[in-house]
Amino acid sequence: MNQEQIKSFWNDHPCGDHIVGGLHQRFDDDYERFFAAYDAWRYDQESHIPAMLDRVDWRGKRVLEIGLGQGAESEQLIRRGALWSGLDLTDESVDRVRTRLAARALPYEDLRQGSVLDIPWADDSFDLVFSHGVLHHVPDVHRAQAEIHRVLRPGGALVAMLYARHSLNYQVSIRLVRRAALAAAYPLRHSGRLARAPMLRQHLDNAERVGLRHYLALDTFTHRSTDGPLNPFARVYSTQDARRDFPSFELVAASKCYLHAPPLPVRRLSLSGRRMGWHLWVRLDARPESTPAQGVPAETAWTDEFGEVSL
C-alpha cells in the first residue's frame, strides 16, 4: 500500500460526497446547495461533533487541520475563533474547502495540498493539530505522528478522531455480520440476483479477485469495510493502540461517540455511543523532546475521560 493509491482513492471519492448524491452529479456543481445538504446530513448523523469541538478552546490558537473532507469541521473551527490552516492529501478536497471558505467569507491563515508524512510547515508552527477521521487511513502513522509533533509548539496537542476497536461496528458488524453475509452471498455472485446491491457486488468482485478466504481475513476485510469496498487502508484503535502508535504524545483524554453499525438498525434504538461508539476522540499532548514514552500501559476499563479533563 502506498500513498499514491490512498491519494487516488480519496481524490476520486471525496469523503461523504456520494452520500448526499455528489457535487458533480445531483448538485450540478452548485457548491452552496451541496455544502448545505452535506452539513445537514453530517450534523444529523454525527450530532455529537459540535459538542465535542466545544470541549476544546480554539480561540486565538494557531490550528492545523489535517484531512479536510468537505470542510465542515474547517468552518466549525474558524467560527470558534481558530487561526486556521488546512492540509489535505488531495487537490479535490483543497479546492472544495477553498471554495467553501471563500463563499462564506471565512478568514483563515493557509490552505495547502500535501502529506502528513512531510508536513509543509516549519517546526513549532501550531498550538493545536486537529484531525477527524484521517489518521487511521495512514499506513505509516509513526512517521505521521512524528511530523505532527514537529510542527507543534511546546505544550501543543493533537485532537483526533480515530475509528474505535471496541465498538459495535467493529466487533459485531464488521467482524461478524458483514463477513458472514458476504460468505453467504458469495455462491450467488454470478447469478444476477445482486445487481441492485452495488456495494455488495463490489465486495464480491474484490473477493473473487483475491480469493474469498484471503478477503475475509480481518486484516484485509477491515480496510474494505470502513469507507467502502474500494478504500485501500484503514485501521481501528483502542486507547492502548493510540498510546502505541503515537509515542511522541501522551494520551490525556478520550471519549467514544456515535453508535453506528450498518446494516444493524442501531439508530432506532436511541442508545448512547459512550461505550460501543465507532468514533474514538482522543487528546494527545506533545511530549517534550527529551521525554520518550515509557512503554505501553495496559488497556483499562472505559471511562469518558474526554469530558472530565480540561482541554
Predicted regions and their residues:
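A short acidic, Gly/Pro-enriched loop at the edge of an enzyme's catalytic core
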Residues: 117-128
